[in-house]
Amino acid sequence: MLFRSATIHGRGQIQRVELAADKDGRLTAVRVRLIGDMGAYLQLVTPGVPLLGAFLYAGVYDLPQAYDFSCTSVFTTMTPTDAYRGAGRPEATYAIEVAMDALARKMKLDPYELRKRNYIKREQYFDKDGNQAGYTAFHGLNYDSGDHLAAAEKAMKHADYQGVRKKQATQNVPGARKRLGIGMTSYFEMCGLAPSRVLASLNYGAGGWESATVRVLPTSKVQVVTGTSPHGQGHETSWAMIAAEKLGISPDDVDVLHSDTAIAPLGLDTYGSRSL
């Protein structure tokens, strides 16, 4: 007997991105028009994929409040789309980085130079008193820390960016059968969807709730009952180590229980780095 199975599609979007910049190449506005293919019906978080992407189109760039995003989601005869490896971030990152390359060509700037002019600066993560207050982006989310220019400079040094540019100029002559391309990208990852007011404001699963119970048994052993069910993440080891450290006992004295609704009836999901 032959069994066949299928799963979700991870990507299904048509994106139109427009950038505005001043004469020095600094971004002043971003407009995104998105058509999202939902597939034949909604899966777990099908509409959430373009919604998460909406927070990520600015990338790691210091974008002012001029951000215009609109998404139209449509049902089609295709397999449903849903969260798979990034859930909105790969689509948004691809779009903004391709748009940055196009802007660099239009302004006759090196693509890396354009990015350097627009990175969120390290000092923007600190308040006037020198406290690390984080950077609040145009959409209201707060990024706690970052030094994007330093990270990029280190990457470019290791990649010998200037040397590769010279090789590109030599190799990409008219009529060449092989041409050398250079790509660069950086991004924020929106993951770890823990209980939060942000998720609640999006009407997402009661704010991304989760449950856990710790019991000290008469035998002096400890039980940790978790609503997240592991499938390769190593929850049993990690939860036992965390509980043991906090309670001052050996991890061998901690039992982690999961995946049984008779024991742990309350649990949302294990995905998107929201457990480990």
Task: Describe these PLM feature segments.
Residues M1-F3, L44-G59, A83-N118, L141, ...:
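Alpha-helical support elements that line or immediately flank enzyme active sites
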Residues M1-F3, T28-R33, Y61-P64, P111-I120, ...:
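Beta-strand segments within the central parallel beta-sheet cores of soluble alpha/beta enzyme folds
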Residues F3-I8, L34-G39, G48, I120-R122, ...:
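Acidic, glycine-rich active-site loops and adjacent beta-strand->loop/helix elements
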Residues I8-G10, A21-A54, E97, K106-E153:
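Molybdopterin (Moco) oxidoreductase catalytic core of the xanthine/aldehyde oxidoreductase family
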Residues I14-V98, S196-E210, T270, R274-L276:
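Glycine-rich loop/linker segments at domain edges
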Residues Y67-M78, V214-P218, L257-G267:
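Flexible hinge/switch segments at interdomain interfaces of large molecular machines
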